[in-house]
């Protein structure tokens, strides 16, 4: 286990011949258990080879009480595909006032299950179900300073 950032635990997934990364129900169960035990109520598996990869892909388990401090990414796009559960992506202005909210769901056909944004808006994720499991993709390489934490949060 190694750290992806100062707040998330990174669990290295099994890799198989040919550079394939496989992740199944057993892995999902283990990741969910890790999120339940983690003091920040989330855990991730990074499926990219390293922080220099041009595409950064992660499978993330969030518990309902997980707090994601509002932040923004400099010069990066970001997308979420909800695999299980429900969440909202909440956007804020420079003063911390909510400006938009996008509800995502893996099971409610009236809500989208996918979100992609290229704006450098302040945002956070609010878990609406007992837990949520997402596939997140962002542009690399990963640089810790590319993510700015909101000073008002």
Please provide the spans of the model-predicted regions.
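A short, N-terminal "cap"/entry segment at the start of jelly-roll beta-barrel domains
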Residues: 1-55, 100-107
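Cyclic nucleotide-binding regulatory domains
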Residues: 87-115
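Short beta-strand His + acidic residue motifs that chelate non-heme Fe in jelly-roll/DSBH
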Residues: 69-71, 89-91, 115-117, 123-128, ...
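Double-stranded beta-helix
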Residues: 99-103, 108-110, 122-153
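Conserved hydrophobic/aromatic beta-strand scaffold that supports enzyme active sites
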Residues: 59-61, 79, 114-116, 136
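Glycine- and acidic-residue-biased ligand/ion/polar-headgroup-sensing regions
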Residues: 64, 75-95
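Short strand-connecting beta-turns/loops that link adjacent beta-strands
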Residues: 52-53, 75, 130
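Conserved short histidine dyad/triad with adjacent acidic residue
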Residues: 59-76, 119
């Amino acid at each position: 286990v190694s750290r992806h950032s100062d707040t998330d635990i990174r669990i290295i997934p099994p890799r198989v011949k040919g550079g394939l990364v496989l992740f199944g129900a057993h892995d999902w169960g283990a990741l969910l258990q890790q999120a339940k035990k983690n003091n920040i109520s989330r855990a991730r598996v990074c499926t990219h080879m390293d922080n220099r990869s041009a595409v950064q892909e992660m499978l993330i388990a969030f518990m309902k009480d997980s707090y994601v401090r509002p932040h923004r990414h400099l010069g990066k796009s970001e997308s979420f595909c909800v695999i299980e559960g429900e969440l909202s992506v909440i956007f804020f202005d420079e003063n911390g006032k909510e400006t938009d909210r996008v509800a995502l769901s893996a099971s409610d056909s009236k809500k989208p299950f996918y979100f992609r944004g290229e704006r450098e808006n302040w945002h956070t994720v609010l878990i609406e179900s007992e837990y949520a499991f997402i596939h997140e993709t962002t542009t690399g390489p990963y640089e810790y300073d590319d993510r700015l934490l909101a000073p008002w949060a």
